[in-house]
Amino acid sequence: MVSAPSGAGKSTLVNVVLARDARLKLSVSYTTRAPRAGEVDGREYHFVDAGTFQAMADRGDFLESARVHGNLYGTSRRWIEGIQAQNLDIILEIDWQGARQMRRIFPGAVTIFIFPPSLPELERRLRSRGKDTEIGRAHV
């Protein structure tokens, strides 16, 4: 599991690691967040509306789920179980709430927390993403 505040560099690090080892599979989370420019449904996230997400949660489709900055995120139980059945390793790019839930389910999982280079750099990254809002500043 790789966890970090928004803008710390999780995705960059995960993409480098995935490019080096084809045996690693990235879990693509479900979210109610709107896609950012350049994001593709099913690649960065599975983008769903709140009603669909809640129905999935009610059915037990998620191993973990969390509300982060007003949006819902969840990890697919079926996908994780399918990859485990193939004896492949999984990378979860996940927030601290999800990481805590997953550690309870998989206590032997390796957890990596990434810190941003500095608070000013983190703020710069968040502003460049268009997160120059109260929520964006709350990250810092």
Residue ranges of predicted features:
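Walker A/P-loop
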Residues: 11
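Conserved small/polar residues in nucleotide/adenosyl-binding loops
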Residues: 138-140
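Post-Walker A helix-loop "phosphate-sensing" segment adjacent to the P-loop in P-loop NTPases
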Residues: 18-27
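Conserved phosphate-donor/acceptor-positioning beta-strand/loop module used by diverse small-molecule
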Residues: 90-95, 105-127
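P-loop (Walker A) phosphate-binding loop of NTP-binding proteins
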Residues: 3-5
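ATP-dependent small-molecule kinase phosphotransfer cores
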Residues: 29-90, 96-100
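ATP-binding Walker
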Residues: 8
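The feature captures the helix immediately C-terminal to the Walker
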Residues: 14-15
